[in-house]
């Protein structure tokens, strides 16, 4: 059920340099303060290294598996955190979760568009139907407290060149996310 996660871990003098474990790490210098920040990725996760800490953002499911069709539970999330800790050579068990998105896929009998057209209004949220296979519910005010998204996961996977697991090639996959 866990989808995208945002993690923050404090950085001290004893924290090893994790930039050497990142893909395409780039340094950015603030010419006013002299602070050097490093931005890179690790198997699809966005990793940002600041003076005070390390930020990690992305889908732990995509990090653990070749796609995010299978949602993570508490056990597989712990496996993903352990793999990430091993890859960066730091302990992330005490990292703070600063953001968490929930989502899952439903295998439907009919095309996803048939179901999206049946979903009605939600209290205090506006309905946005951007294209045939995507539906969002967003807050009416300026604050974006939560967003609900429903979309065709198979079409999304094809657009992102993501391989679907065996047996899902012909499935109608309705993805639900709470962001």
Label the model's feature ranges.
Residues 1-179:
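Structured, helix-rich domain cores that form ligand/interaction pockets
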